[in-house]
């Protein structure tokens, strides 16, 4: 079930360095929210904070509140593994388990949860391969290694793996940056289909992609080297690209910087 994300006064640190300053925003269910901005502005840091992935970096910490519906994912006693199960992530470069079969890649998360029934696993693999428009391309080689697929197919396989554990939210960190235009189009079409069931947040450097796939867009900016990134504005994507409120947003969209 798609859920809402709310950030309230979020500050992100790595040791003594403040990477992100005072971010508050809402990510609506069954929609696509795009994070845009120049390199180093904090958009990927904020994305990784949404499912506590930033915690793999020593010294990382968050101040403020991140709510999944009404649950604070940083509250004492909340298991980060459970958070990452509810809020899945697809990374910049496709990262299937290379020696694992296509079928086993999809159901890897279920196996970690203790599911062993072969029919359940097979049916699940087929269901989510169909859901990512990959089934017809791989149905005759399900036992072949996932690493043998093309880049675009590997990324769709990773998306199938991410949604097979039925998360509430799906995070995508530049999912098309290493793909060719045809594969990119396939991923973008898939995002449009997936938002009917999931809440999606995507980081992209491609402003045309943000305009094509997202319902709302958040623009992040870095005032100066060594200063924290911050959220400049968030609004409906059409408004951000046609009539932004902030001059910094207009300057970035128009190519004056970034």
Curated annotation (Swiss-Prot):
It is found in: Cell membrane. ATP binds at residues 37-44. This is Phosphate import ATP-binding protein PstB. The lineage of its organism: Bacteria, Bacillati, Actinomycetota, Actinomycetes, Mycobacteriales. Belongs to the ABC transporter superfamily. Phosphate importer (TC 3.A.1.7) family. GO terms for cellular component: plasma membrane. Part of the ABC transporter complex PstSACB involved in phosphate import. Responsible for energy coupling to the transport system. The keyword Aminoacyl-tRNA synthetase does not apply. It holds the Pfam family ABC_tran. Keywords: ATP-binding, Cell membrane, Membrane, Nucleotide-binding, Phosphate transport, Translocase, Transport. The complex is composed of two ATP-binding proteins (PstB), two transmembrane proteins (PstC and PstA) and a solute-binding protein (PstS). It catalyses: phosphate(out) + ATP + H2O = ADP + 2 phosphate(in) + H(+). One of its GO terms (biological process) is phosphate ion transmembrane transport. One of its GO terms (molecular function) is ATP hydrolysis activity. Transmembrane segments: none annotated. CDD domains: ABC_PstB_phosphate_transporter (cd03260). Residues 5-247 form the ABC transporter domain. Gene3D superfamilies: P-loop containing nucleotide triphosphate hydrolases. Its EC number is 7.3.2.1. InterPro entries: AAA+_ATPase (IPR003593), ABC_transporter-like_ATP-bd (IPR003439), ABC_transporter-like_CS (IPR017871), P-loop_NTPase (IPR027417), PstB-like (IPR005670). It is a peripheral membrane protein.
């Amino acid at each position: 079930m798609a859920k809402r994300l709310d950030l309230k006064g979020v500050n992100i640190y790595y040791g003594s360095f403040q990477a992100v300053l005072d971010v508050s925003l809402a990510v609506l269910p069954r929609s696509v929210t795009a994070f845009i901005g120049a390199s180093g502005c904090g958009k990927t840091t904020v994305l990784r904070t949404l499912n506590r992935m930033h915690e793999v970096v020593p010294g990382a910490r968050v101040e403020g509140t991140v709510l999944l519906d009404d649950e604070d994912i940083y509250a004492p006693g909340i298991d980060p593994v459970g958070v990452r199960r509810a809020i899945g992530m697809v990374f910049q470069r496709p990262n299937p388990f290379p020696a694992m079969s296509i079928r086993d890649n999809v159901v890897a998360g279920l196996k970690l949860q203790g599911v062993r029934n072969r029919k359940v696993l097979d049916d699940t693999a087929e269901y989510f391969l169909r859901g990512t428009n990959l089934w017809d391309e791989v149905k005759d080689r399900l036992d072949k290694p996932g690493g043998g697929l093309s880049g675009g197919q590997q990324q769709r396989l990773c998306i199938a793996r991410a949604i097979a554990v039925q998360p509430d939210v799906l995070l995508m960190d530049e999912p098309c940056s290493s793909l060719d235009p045809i594969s990119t189009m396939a991923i973008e079409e898939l995002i449009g289909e997936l938002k009917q069931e999931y809440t999606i947040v995507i980081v992209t450097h491609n402003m045309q992609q943000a305009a094509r796939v997202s319902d709302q867009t958040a623009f992040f900016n870095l005032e100066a080297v060594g200063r924290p990134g911050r959220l400049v504005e968030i609004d409906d994507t059409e408004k951000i690209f046609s009539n932004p409120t902030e001059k910094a947003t207009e300057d970035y969209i128009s190519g004056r910087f970034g």
